[in-house]
């Protein structure tokens, strides 16, 4: 199944998307986390979802992949702008509504979209994500992850092999104990990322993201059926964040993946695809 590339215009912004499957099927929009392009929604993962009877769309957030990028170190948009980009993609595909599936930051964007535009959101699935709120009592990111990425400033970004090694290492440190780290596949995806990115360094602009604070504490207003998928060894958003999400969003369901990290490991694809598919289809049947 070869994905079809399509660029969506939103004012002076270009959003690069790819779609899999039959456009007549219910749409699933995949939203990746901070600093990562749509490449990290592995094409085979997308195909498996499409084979379940969905029209699957993945896209590059601003400052990643082939979408509009800005000079490194500058902030030109807010978190709410990224949430509105979700709607722009849906409008570009003439979708009145869609199932939203977000990884990490993508899961928070799904929450924002569900709060702001409830009529456009059929369901939300949040993978390795956290509640859109300032929950200082919840455990933070593992210091080892921060220490690893602090080395990015010393990296020779002109040396492609070193850059790929850095990207692979960044995913390795997020891997849980459930499965061995899939270095071969991760390296292939990193190579693809490097080849297709307009400006790789612009991904770090996501560290300047602000905006949407006025929506803190409103995730309990979400009416869309919500599914939470979270590993018990997540080093970015520890498992307590999943429990907080489940407690906050009414009638949400939690799929706990024991030993999984901040990742969508290939050996867990069947489990995750089944959970997303069942969640979306149950909602259609309920309606």
Pin down the residues of each PLM region.
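Alpha/beta-hydrolase
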Residues: 144-217, 224, 244
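Conserved alpha/beta-hydrolase "acid-adjacent" motif
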Residues: 235-241
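Conserved HGGG/HGGXW glycine-rich cap/lid loop of the alpha/beta-hydrolase fold
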Residues: 13-69
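Catalytic active-site module of serine/aspartate enzymes centered on a nucleophile-bearing elbow/loop
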Residues: 252-287
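Conserved acidic catalytic loop of the alpha/beta-hydrolase fold
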Residues: 80-98
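Short beta-strand/loop motif that positions the catalytic acidic residue
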Residues: 222, 228-230
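Flexible "cap/lid" loop of the alpha/beta hydrolase fold
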Residues: 123-157
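Short glycine-enriched nucleophile-adjacent loop
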Residues: 107-118, 124
């Amino acid at each position: 199944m070869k994905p079809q590339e399509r660029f969506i215009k939103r004012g002076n912004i270009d959003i690069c998307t790819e779609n899999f499957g039959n456009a007549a099927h219910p749409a699933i929009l995949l939203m990746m986390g901070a600093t990562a392009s749509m490449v990290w929604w592995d094409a085979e993962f997308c195909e498996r979802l499409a084979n379940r009877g969905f029209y699957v769309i993945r896209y590059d957030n601003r400052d990643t992949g082939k979408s509009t990028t800005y000079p490194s170190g500058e902030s030109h948009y807010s978190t709410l702008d990224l949430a509105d980009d979700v709607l722009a993609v849906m409008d570009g595909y003439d979708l009145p509504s869609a199932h939203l599936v977000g990884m990490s930051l993508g899961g928070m964007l799904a929450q924002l979209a569900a709060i702001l535009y409830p009529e456009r959101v059929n369901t939300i699935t949040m993978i390795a994500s956290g509640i859109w709120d300032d929950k200082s009592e919840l455990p933070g990111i593992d210091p080892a992850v921060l220490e690893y990425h602090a080395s990015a400033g010393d990296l020779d970004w002109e040396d492609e092999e070193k850059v790929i090694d850095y990207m692979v290492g960044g995913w390795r440190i997020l891997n849980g104990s459930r499965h061995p780290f899939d270095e071969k596949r991760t390296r292939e995806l990193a190579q693809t990322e490097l080849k297709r990115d307009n400006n790789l360094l612009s991904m770090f602009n996501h560290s300047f993201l602000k905006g949407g604070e006025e929506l803190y504490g409103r995730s309990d207003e979400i009416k869309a059926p919500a599914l939470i998928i979270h590993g018990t060894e997540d080093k970015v958003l520890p498992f307590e964040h999943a429990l907080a999400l489940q407690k906050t969003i009414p009638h949400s369901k939690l799929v706990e993946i024991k030993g999984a990290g901040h990742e969508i490991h290939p050996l867990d694809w069947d489990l995750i695809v089944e959970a997303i598919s069942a969640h979306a289809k149950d909602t259609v049947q309920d309606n």
